[in-house]
């Protein structure tokens, strides 16, 4: 009985701390992965020769 209680507590601990780790790491990952340029875009080929591709959610060219 004690073993199963311990595993439940451990699972709860992991479940509560893991989202915090993801929330802390997410902006860092996005900052590294998406380097926004000054160019705005509305079409896929607006960013050719500048930054790579168009992020249609932000309407900006990204590397």
Swiss-Prot record:
Keywords annotated in UniProt: Disulfide bond, Knottin, Signal, Virulence
Disulfide bond positions: 37-51, 41-54, 47-61
Propeptide: 24-35
Signal peptide from the UniProt entry: 1-23
Statement: the UniProt record of this protein carries the keyword Disulfide bond: yes
Keyword Disulfide bond on entry: yes
Function: This necrosis-inducing peptide induces a hypersensitive response on Cf-9 tomato genotypes. Race-specific elicitors are compounds which only induce defense responses in genotypes of host plants which are resistant to the pathogenic race that produces the elicitor, but not in susceptible genotypes.
Domain remarks: The presence of a 'disulfide through disulfide knot' structurally defines this protein as a knottin.
Name used for this protein in its record: Race-specific elicitor A9
